[in-house]
Amino acid sequence: MNAQAEEFKKYLETNGIKPKQFHKKELIFNQWDPQEYCIFLYDGITKLTSISENGTIMNLQYYKGAFVIMSGFIDTETSVGYYNLEVISEQATAYVIKINELKELLSKNLTHFFYVFQTLQKQVSYSLAKFNDFSINGKLGSICGQLLILTYVYGKETPDGIKITLDNLTMQELGYSSGIAHSSAVSRIISKLKQEKVIVYKNSCFYVQNLDYLKRYAPKLDEWFYLACPATWGKLN
């Protein structure tokens, strides 16, 4: 937790915005209801998903607190789209702020305005890096890119490799978050990565044993972590 996030939390509470507690599998917002909010995820882990008409689930992004998630446009105060934000950690603490309240709060304090602006700026550059790597290297690049993201954000070094400490990360979940809906395609790529000793899967967890391989197929994402999150990048490099 950085100092800016702590100060933003205090600023919200000083202005009457109280934290809400959520539990695993709860939805902070869902794609069937209006979503004109700013969510300040203080702690916990969530995932942003979209469910198609035929029931296909796509995991668009994982968020780890502290993080700012915008579900409404600041200028029009309308929804940016219809998605689900599901809690996947045991508990999560979030501040749910109406867009008109956010505008008023940020107009009074440039420090917090720039904190939110910087966070959203990072999200845009992250999305560009992800789109680049997922597009250029096909399905293998998508899986390697998503594994690299999860390794940097949730990785912990162990004797067996870098353990991705995200609960219940199955091959199906990995496929959904990589934009691959067919489990057979995910299975083939995972088998290839196992054979090449890039990863192992045991005790319901992925272990990365060749980080350089993932970086080779996701260079822009690796570059993004190096530039935007140097402390996170430096722990494993």
Swiss-Prot record:
The name this protein goes by in its record: Listeriolysin regulatory protein
Encoding gene per record: prfA
Entries under PROSITE patterns matching the protein: HTH_CRP_1, HTH_CRP_2
Keyword Secreted assigned: no
A single GO molecular function term of this UniProt record: DNA binding
Gene Ontology CC: cytosol
Keywords: Activator, DNA-binding, Transcription, Transcription regulation, Virulence
Function, in words: Positively regulates expression of listeriolysin, of 1-phosphadidylinositol phosphodiesterase (PI-PLC) and other virulence factors.
Entry annotated with the keyword DNA-binding: yes
HTH crp-type domain residues: 137-212
Taxonomy, superkingdom: Bacteria
